[in-house]
Amino acid sequence: MANLSYWLLALFVATWTDVGLCKKRPKPGGWNTGGSRYPGQGSPGGNRYPPQGGGTWGQPHGGGWGQPHGGGWGQPHGGGWGQPHGGGWGQGGGTHNQWNKPNKPKTSMKHMAGAAAAGAVVGGLGGYMLGSAMSRPMLHFGNDWEDRYYRENMNRYPNQVYYRPVDQYNNQNNFVHDCVNITIKQHTVTTTTKGENFTETDVKMMERVVEQMCVTQYQKESQAYYDGRRSSAVLFSSPPVILLISFLIFLIVG
């Protein structure tokens, strides 16, 4: 961790030093910078060629011969042949190279797949995420018939749970309660859409199965959350990082 911090400090110092040197370099001048304009354009107060605001002989508004408004021959308003209002051939007002416009950027399938693999928030579920697949636990329900029924039908029950980040809950019970409700609701709706219905026994067993998986999901997410906070605290409390932050503040303020 210390070596990484020193490398980060060296990288930022080199970067900001280069930026400071770039700011002090004089700006390169272009051709004819600060002088007169391109030959033939003239200065704002000088003469221009050809004269502005008028045309040649027989051109009251700057068009060619017989062109009262600046169009081609037989074009009263500046369009092409057969174009009364300035469009391209066969176009009533647009430009003539519509097909030369750049194509709209397409969404990369690689980006979409990457977002899905990263566990993005499930659309339409108000910020819920879908956990990774789990093995369904072996449960006992107090009698042989229910135990046998569970073993025969356990593959019909969820093996993934929906949940929100653990920092949105005060304790494990609230997390598990919310996790069980949304998971069973989503699973039953999806399965019913496929033409399969659940009995009261199925719902009872699903509640037990999903509860166990939600507890496991909470423990996993809590551990990851606290590990992340501890790592951040250790990183930002190390002397090299504190020195780096102080140096950046000095550069920004100064």
Curated annotation (Swiss-Prot):
Cu(2+) 1 binds at H61, G62, G63. Residues 232-254 form a propeptide. One of its GO terms (cellular component) is plasma membrane. A lipid is attached at S231 (GPI-anchor amidated serine). Disulfide bonds join C179-C214. Cu(2+) 4 binds at H85, G86, G87. The keyword Repeat applies. It comes from the Eukaryota. Residues 90-231 are annotated as: PrP27-30 (protease resistant core). Glycans are attached at N181, N197. It is a lipid-anchor; GPI-anchor. Residues 52-95 have a biased composition (Gly residues). Keywords: Amyloid, Cell membrane, Copper, Disulfide bond, Glycoprotein, Golgi apparatus, GPI-anchor, Lipoprotein, Membrane, Metal-binding, Prion, Repeat, Signal, Zinc. It holds the Pfam family Prion_octapep. One of its GO terms (biological process) is protein homooligomerization. Cu(2+) 3 binds at H77, G78, G79. GO terms for molecular function: copper ion binding. It is linked to PrP is found in high quantity in the brain of humans and animals infected with the degenerative neurological diseases kuru, Creutzfeldt-Jakob disease (CJD), Gerstmann-Straussler syndrome (GSS), scrapie, bovine spongiform encephalopathy (BSE), transmissible mink encephalopathy (TME), etc. PANTHER family: DOPPEL PRION, MAJOR PRION PROTEIN. This is Major prion protein. It comes from Nothocricetulus migratorius (Gray dwarf hamster).
